[in-house]
């Protein structure tokens, strides 16, 4: 990622983005597939990822080989195979099962602002990852992740909070991710050098 980004999203030629919206200063890397999703300003998705029916906030850091909304199969039916809901692929006189796809879409994934999804992690349908949360490499996230919480493992479990709850609440109230590009540049040294408490005190959180 050693290129100059801009308000125009960057999508690698080998990536595929369909029926989705990409914010300003965003980047989609090699061989990644994004469909029916949205990517907030400044967020990036590294190589070989798959996002479907997922809303990603601003400043999200998505490492390589991440899967968001790994779709479910019908475990309650006599067969798991998709011929039951993709029937028109197999028979000219059969149709796809609209209700099944609507059920899948009703279990969208939400990824908050300033989040980090580690390499090879998977976020299952219907899960929400809160603002400021981090997901460890290889984790399988089956339940909602609280804001500013670090989770890891299979299934993912909380390891610790990034900050105490009061500090986390102050960051969410500050909502620095909504600052404009010029203000972010002015605060760059503070992001780099101040502690969380010092940053909040200076910037009114």
Whereabouts are the PLM-identified features?
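Acidic, glycine-centered active-site loop in nucleotide-sugar glycosyltransferases
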Residues: 147, 152-155
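Flexible, glycine/small-residue-enriched loop-and-beta-strand segment within the central core
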Residues: 5-22, 27-125, 154
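C-terminal boundary and immediately downstream tail of ABC-type ATPase nucleotide-binding domains
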Residues: 174-182
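A generic "structured core" feature
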Residues: 130, 134-136, 140
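Short, charge-rich, low-complexity interaction segments located
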Residues: 154-163, 167-168
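Conserved catalytic-core motifs of eukaryotic protein kinase domains, centered on the activation segment
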Residues: 72-74, 145, 161-163
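ABC ATPase nucleotide-binding domains
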Residues: 183-203
């Amino acid at each position: 990622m050693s290129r100059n980004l801009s308000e125009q999203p960057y999508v690698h030629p080998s990536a595929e983005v369909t029926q989705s919206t990409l914010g300003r200063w965003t980047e989609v890397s090699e061989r990644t597939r994004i469909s029916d999703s949205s990517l907030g300003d400044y967020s990036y998705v590294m190589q070989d990822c798959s996002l479907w029916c997922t809303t990603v906030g601003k400043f999200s850091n998505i490492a390589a080989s991440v899967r968001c909304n790994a779709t479910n199969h019908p475990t309650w039916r006599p067969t798991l195979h998709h011929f039951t809901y993709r029937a028109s692929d197999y028979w000219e006189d059969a149709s796809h099962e609209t209700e099944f796809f609507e059920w899948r879409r009703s279990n969208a994934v939400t990824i908050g602002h300033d989040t980090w999804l580690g390499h090879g992690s998977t976020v299952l349908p219907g899960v929400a990852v809160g603002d400021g949360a981090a997901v460890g490499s290889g984790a399988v996230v089956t339940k909602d992740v609280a804001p500013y919480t670090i989770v890891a493992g299979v299934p993912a479990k909380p390891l610790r909070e990034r900050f105490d709850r009061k500090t986390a609440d102050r960051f969410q109230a500050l909502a620095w991710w909504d600052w404009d590009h010029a203000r972010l540049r002015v605060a760059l040294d503070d992001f780099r050098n101040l502690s969380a408490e010092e940053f909040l005190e200076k910037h009114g959180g």
